[in-house]
Each structure stands twice: as C-alpha cells, then as structure tokens.
C-alpha cells in the first residue's frame, strides 16, 4: 500500500499548499498540532460499519482531526478458540483486503483480549507486535495481564506521547513502501531522555557529555540511535546539527550504515554517508557549516586527523562505547624492539579533532569509565526486561566441560589466565596480556587429545539436537580461544565429518537457486603468515562477506561457524540458537558473546550456551553486574532435567495401576475403558489427598 507511506509523510512532516491565486502566499499545512498547547480534535468511534469490497465493522477507531490513525481489534479472553493472533489476522488480512481505504491512513494498530494487549502496524509481523509497559519516564514496567492494557491506554495513548510516536517514531525506509517500523517503548523513552540530556549538556554552556544509554544487547539500540538522530536534526535550537555515528568495527559500521543511508527522508537530510577514509572524513567535516549524518569507525581518527571542527552543534553518537572510546590519556607501550612509544587513545584523538562536540554513548555493558567519558546513564533497559517483553529470548546454560578432559588442575591454569585478562571495566585495547598466561591457556585448550574429545562431543551434541528438532534451523557457532585452536578443530571435524566441508545447496528442494555452501566454515581474517591451506580456506574480504550473508540466510546450507573474535559482537542472526564456548571470556565481552543466541525467531523458545571451559560463574557474575541487580542466574539444563524427573515421578504415581499395554495395543473400546478406569483412579487419589490435608489442617 504505497499510499500509506505518502499519507504518513503528510501527517508527520506537513506539506505546502499552493494557492490558485498567485497573489496570495502559499500555506504550510500541518495535519496534527504537535505543540504542547494541543488544539487537535480526538474522537473515539465504536463499531463503525465500513463498506469496501464487503462490509466490515472495526471494534474501535481513534480519529485525530478526522483522520483514522489508530484502529483497535478486540477479542474475548474467555473463548479458548479465539486468540490474539486472530485479531492480528483480522486487521492485517481481512481488513486490508476488504476495507483498504481505512487502513491506508493508519499510524498504528492495537490488538487486545484485555489480558494481552499489543501494538504494531499493518506491515509488522505478528511476532513483532509488542506490549507498551511503561506509562512515564522513570516509572516501573507494568507487571502483566490487565495492567498492560491500562498502561498501553495511559502510556502510548497519552495525547503527548501518541503525537510524538506518530510524528517522530514511525519510520519508512527510503527504498520501501511495505516496511513500516514503529518504536518499542524502551526505544521511545531512551531517545526522549537522551535528546533532553544532550540539549542540557551542549557546549559552550554544558560539558559536552550527552549521556550514556544502557540497553540490553538485542533490544534495538541502532533504531534508538535513528529515532534520536531525527529528534536532533529537526530541533531548530540546534541549527541543523552534524551527527557523527561512530563504531569500533567495520562490520558494525556496515550494519549501521545500511539503516541510516536508507533513512534520508526520515532524517530530513540527503547527506547521509559512510566515511571510508581519513581523507574523506577530513573533507566532509573540516569546512562543513551544518547538517549531514556521517558514519565511520573510531580508527579513522588517527594521529594525522588533527582539528576538524570547533562547532558546538556536532553530536557524536558512539555504538558499543565501552570497548574502544574511553581512553582520553596518552599511554606508553613497548614495541617488538623494546622501544617505548607514546600512543594517544582513540577517544583523545576524537576529542582533539572535535573539541566542542557533544558525545553520547550507547552500550549493552556499561562500566564506570563509560560514564566518565559520556556522562551519567540517562536510561536503562536490562536483559531481564527484554526477555519479559518478548524482545529477546531466554538463554539456557549447559555445562559439558567435564566431558572433554578438563580437570581441576587445568581449570586452575585457565583461572590464572583470567587474572591477566581484561580487568573489569578495562578496555581490551588498553591491556597487554601476560604471554606466559596466554601460552598456558592455549596449551591446555589446544591439547590434541582434548580437541579430539571436544570435536567428538560437539558432533554428538549437535547431531542429537538436529535429530530431536531442538534447533529451529540448525545454526550454531563455536567460539575457540585462538586461531591455531580454531584451525586444528576445523581439521579434526573435517576428518570426522568430511561431508560437512563440502559445498552443497540446502536440502530444501525449494532452495535450488541458493548458493552452494559447506555446512561447516572457519571464519577468521587471514594473515600473511598463514600456511597455504589455511590462507586459501579463509579467503578475502569479499568471501567473508559471502559467508556473512549465507550464515544469516536461515535456509542456506551454512550451519556451523567456527570463530575466534569475529561475529561474537554486533552480529545478528535471529535463527542462531546454539553457541558452544571453548574460550575464556568474561565481563562485557561475555555478555556480548552469549547474546548472539537471544534474538527472537519463529519457533525459537530460548538460546542455548554450551560450556566446554567452565564459565558459568563468570556468566552469572557478568549478567548480575549488567542487569541492575535484577537477575537470578541463567537457566541450567540440569535444573530442567530435575524438574522433568520430578514430574515423571508424579505421573508414575498417578498411573500406578494403569494398564498401558491395553491402552496402546487394545481396540477402541478397550482403550476407552482403560482411560475411564484411570480417570476414576485419579479422582480417588485426589479425594484421598484432600482428606489427608483436611485431617492435617485440623
């Protein structure tokens, strides 16, 4: 429905009205009054009959200034055969087909059975309809049930909030009229809080610390950045600011660039560009008086960049700010020749280049230094909240270290390695690891006999999950401790399962046009010192991009990725549901890594982390630290086994005298008879239990 996009642009942006009389000045029309002194006319209409190809009666329509912008479909919670998804289908299929003239005006759709209430758009998949669980900034989320209905009505449909959502938080990509993205409540409150904080901290009056946003990995921080950027770009007080979005890795830069360069209309600026070189960065920023949205990596700010601009309306938004953009000092390092060299941190170089800019940090794992550089946390959205909202799935833990010859002495060696690893709150770019500790760790984890045991157990575990249909698409990632270990493991798996490394098309007959791919691939950047076989296997940058695309393709034959550092942060594959970890990781890096399996995907109930090294305590400690104290630990498969065993014992007691042979092998009459017999036995047992309880109570 291309008209929907155009109508929304008129509603959100307004439009000029040209007079027939050239002597009269043209008018600029705004369909919605966005000022606080609200002059809009709101009307709720119930059960309005609308005739299109057939007659339909939407339950509720909210009109603003005569425009049907919010459409409700309600279902009863007392009829088991009527579901919330039925309401979704009624709006997005039947109403779209039969009364499309109504739907082309919609800003958002709401479905509710009073217990469950969600919102989305005509183009939103059902699994991405979410609840609005917060009324106002700083308040707690609604617990659930009826509370979520009232929170949606008093929060999302609050006049001021609804106006803002309609005009600033609905986004159509430039190249599509069939994609319409609407904010989730944490994105709305985060963008609003950051926007106000930036205004208060702008230089020269402020300190240039725009604030830190702590958002759980997978909660959609890149869209929060997009929403925030629009608010900044349209603010007259900022005089057409220049926005610089900074990441620390090329793949993250590519992902963010893909969103922003397709949002020029939404951002109200045609100059939205990815900066690929230092020279281009200098050219774009040095003499620019205003405007523009630029995406780059922090590494572009090298020693030679020097001063780029002294303007005060430059906003630098840093993605994953905890990793590389904290060092404001000069550090001294020893090179391979034993010479002492002075090196300026990326953060210092960035601020030297743009001394009067305001800096904003986005992170899923905030540390103290993040707030020292970017300012206090202005809004928070934890992993626990994300799971409760259905934005991400739960992560389940399974320990298998005992199965791969990792005894307590070797675990002690790995613990010694941890002591030399990144200390909590430190950046990996600031720490020189102990060579001895690293060597000991690699000797333990790379032991040939151990790797054989790991490979054998991995194959058994992975194939069992495939057989049991415990994985939605068979996508798995194996994290190794070093390049050498990853290469050795790949060769062992190739020897044990040679067909895994042969390029094939997906087994699905409908995928004949897909690119052939091996089931198992080693994903690393090759180096000049790699041997010929490894060098050829790893391929160049274009080959790695192909692997990236294939792994993200749910139905491609590429199912298992062996990695060391690549793809463990900022790499989204919603169908990925199994991660095998054989690498010492802790703190924010561990949270970022395991979050690869927490994305929502149809049929995916949880993400599984399989531990070959013994990181359970590190996982619980890290998540406890980064969850605002609202986390009770990872679910463990051993706990599930205990629960199932307990339930089986209860069932065994209930079915103690049940004739299973007659039930499974008898004729229909015999099956019915034994079922009734069991039902009577169950009633008798329940009656005895109740009598015992009454006797005990008296």
For each of these PLM feature ranges, what is it?
Residues 1-247, 251-267, 289-293, 311-313, ...:
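ATP-dependent helicase/translocase motor core
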Residues 601-697:
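Long, hydrophobic alpha-helical segments
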Residues 290-349, 542-548, 563-565:
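Conserved RecA-like ASCE ATPase "motif II neighborhood" in helicase/translocase motors
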